[in-house]
Amino acid sequence: MKLLADSPTVHCHVLLPVRVCGDPPAPLSFFCLSLTPLHCVSLHDRRVMLRLTSDHFPIFVPLGVIGFYRYLWYLIRIAASLVYRPIPLPENPTYIASEDVTIIVPTIDAGDEFKEAAHSWLAGSPKEIIIVTEENMRGPLQELADAVDPARIRVLTVPYANKRLQMAHGIKHTTTDIIVFADDDAIWPPTLLPYVLACFEDQRIGGVGTSQRVQPVGARMTVWEVLAAFRLSIRNIEIASSTHIDGGIPCLSGRTAAYRTVILKDPAFLHGFTHDYWLGRYQLNSGDDKFLTRWMVSHGWGTYVQCCREAELLSTMKPNWRFLKQVLRWTRNTWRSDMRSLFTERYIWTAHPYVAYTMVDKLFNPLTLLVGPCLVAYVVYKSTIPVADGGYHLPWWNVIASYAVWLTATRTAKLLPHLWYRPQDIIYVPAFILFGYYFAIMKLYALFTLHETGWGTRAGIGDPTKATAAADAGDEKLGPPAPAYHDQRQYEQPPIEMR
């Protein structure tokens, strides 16, 4: 100890990194260094500096245990995504895109991005593309179809702009074994369809999704598009890990997903899909992909996600603040669907227990995400009080600076898969941190406004109740008649073992 006392060196306060939950967790306090030589400090202060600054921090030890638990699950998720492998192409495929695939595109737009997307779909050689729109948009979309490929693109209409009714209308006019739903801005690589069809070689698979990346609207990504790209990169890891761990996925994204036509032709599905109500009162228009995913689980069908460059689609996001309205709509849909999966339908518990765990985690995530800054604020407050009056030894600025450094380091680590391909986006990490806290507050707001079922980002979306009533009354304006669906007998719905 004499050598230590006589030598100019550094001293440090050491605090345990803890947090209740979050991904990855942030600490309450941190290693805080002071570069003052020890020979300039009193003996009393040396003793204080060379021990753990305990004060009342032992009350947070249980939170540290939970934080360790969260780190462990984060590493498990990363490890599972690394060992995940996409299904390879079969030597003798059962399904050929030119014979077995119909692409259904519900839309009310006819912009330049739609034409680019249509060309990318045709590069995969599907048998047919069915565009379903409202009556007022038939002319512009028919012109677009004629300009791209009138032989393989067919335009149908419904009386009101309603995505679920548009999808159902397309299903009724499909004659192939596989349906692929696509957003009007989803741009595919030419290899996407073969890799998606490879999953259907397993007769237990009913739905297939893909990984995704953001396609910038302009020459450079805006901060909103970068935030969306961060979210998609994290999602790609999550869906790859859940697919590898228990074969499940919280949602087959509606941007592009493929299904067996025989499942969607079921009258029970079509009725439930177009008559979906929250709490029996509020009819749902968005959240179609959530409904489809839950239907796969509740009816014993397996799902798979092809996370690979060969099947990775590009999708545009709102390049401005309207991205937040998109996120709000998605968040409401997630609340509704997850609560149904966990507490009403309950098939997810036995079919995909890991996915059920992730859903439970999301229920508590907004609260636990806000615990960190709240506890840091408490420590900062205690640091402004004299020690004799029960305050803490650490200076308040030290706590804030250390917390900021910790958040930046952990969030950057979480985004490394994205930054590996786009290192220039590292400057947006602070924006991602702020967005995380905004998102936590927004999730709580979404929870208390689940009765709001509007689209939020698109004008012209019809009232779902009125649109459904028109469809039920047979008021749809049908396009050219299609031959009846040729039911393939090799498809047999697997038995539902989880009931």
Positions of PLM-derived features:
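Multipass alpha-helical transmembrane domains of eukaryotic endomembrane proteins
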Residues: 330-332, 340-364, 409, 413-416
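Membrane-interface alpha-helices
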Residues: 447-473
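N-terminal membrane-anchoring/stem segments of glycan-assembly enzymes
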Residues: 2-97, 246, 417, 439-443, ...
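Non-transmembrane catalytic domains and loops of membrane-associated enzymes and transporters
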Residues: 93-349, 477-499
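Membrane-interface segments at the starts/ends of alpha-helical transmembrane spans
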Residues: 46-59, 351-358, 390-393
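Short hydrophobic helices that act as membrane-entry/anchoring signals
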Residues: 70-73, 77, 81, 225-232, ...
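Membrane-embedded multi-pass helical conduit in multi-pass membrane proteins
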Residues: 57, 63, 72, 79-87, ...
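Compositionally biased, charge-rich terminal segments
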Residues: 46-48, 52, 208-221, 408-427
